[in-house]
Amino acid sequence: MAVPKKRVSKSKRDMRKTTWKNKASKEAKKALSLAKSVSTGKSKSKGFQIKSSN
């Protein structure tokens, strides 16, 4: 017979949500930083070099 799961406490739920949000925020900052360096031409990454059409 199916038994309902125990309820997760608010503090545990909030902790997990905060962890997820912090990870997402960190990745967003990295992406923005890479976008800025690519747009200014200072990127050292091989995959994101802008070729000039001269």
From Swiss-Prot:
A Pfam cross-reference name: Ribosomal_L32p
Residue span of region Disordered: 1-54
Compositional bias annotation for Basic residues: 1-20
Cell compartments where the protein resides: Plastid, Chloroplast
MF (Gene Ontology): structural constituent of ribosome
GO cellular component, one term: chloroplast
InterPro entries linked: Ribosomal_bL32, Ribosomal_bL32_plant/cyanobact, Ribosomal_zn-bd
Record keyword Ribosomal protein present: yes
Entry keyword set: Chloroplast, Plastid, Ribonucleoprotein, Ribosomal protein
Compositional bias (Low complexity): 31-42
GO biological process: translation
Alphabetized PANTHER family for the sequence: 50S RIBOSOMAL PROTEIN L32, CHLOROPLASTIC, LARGE RIBOSOMAL SUBUNIT PROTEIN BL32C
Family designation: Belongs to the bacterial ribosomal protein bL32 family.
NCBIfam families, alphabetized: rpmF_bact (TIGR01031)
Protein name: Large ribosomal subunit protein bL32c
Gene of this entry: rpl32
